[in-house]
Amino acid sequence: KKYDLSLSPDLPLVIMSARIAFEKGFNLVLEILEHLVRYNIQMIIMGDGDKNYISQIVKISKKYPGKLVWVPFSQKDETSLYAGGDLLVLPSNTEPCGLNQLKAMRYGCIPIAHSIGGLKDTITNFDFNNREGNGFVFTNYSALSFYGAIMRAREYYKNKTLWNKLVSQAMRLSYSWDLPATRYVRLFKTAIKLRQEAASENGQK
């Protein structure tokens, strides 16, 4: 309601919160955006940056009122978007780390991402057969591959039982340092023990 979207329960609400720039994949977004909002999704794009990209987004949003909205970046509102959104798109062509996908998954907003950098490390394709994975990825950096990943997510979204399973898995994932730190401590203790045993066998202290 805040963004004047005519929300439909049959269509996923797609979020994109990023600096509006080529590096974040907005060239791909604009290739498919009009087709997406005409037929398949509702979308909120949040961010500041390239005025040419923003102008094109706003132009499309005026053709499809209630389906597409652009808003400037707001840290406070970004969290509410993740909480209310179904999908987060991250079609970056470079991404050293990336935190948006981690924040979004915490709120049950499923990522669709180009498999690169930190996105590749934290997002895996959801597998229908074994029910593993936490999102949808595409490996070829092209509008067609990006569109295909969105359509895969769109099909899974129709199956509410399956979708709820995916959301539940994503929300349970932990990317804190607690687990890796525990493993490193265990590894160091094992290494120290082995060194002490080797020194003892050699008669060294």
Region spans (language model):
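C-terminal alpha-helical cap of glycosyltransferases
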Residues: W177-K205
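Conserved donor-binding loops in enzymes that form glycosidic bonds
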Residues: M16-A21, D48, P72, N140
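A short helix/loop element that forms part of the nucleotide-sugar donor recognition site in Leloir-type
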Residues: K1-D4
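A conserved mid-protein helix/loop that constitutes part of the nucleotide-sugar donor-binding site
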Residues: A21-E34
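Conserved donor-binding/catalytic core segment of Leloir-type glycosyltransferases
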Residues: S6-K24
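Catalytic binding pocket for nucleotide-activated donors in carbohydrate/polymer assembly enzymes
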Residues: A83-V167, M171-R172
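Nucleotide-activated donor-binding/catalytic signature segment of Leloir-type glycosyltransferases, i.e.
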Residues: N40, I44-G47, K51-S80
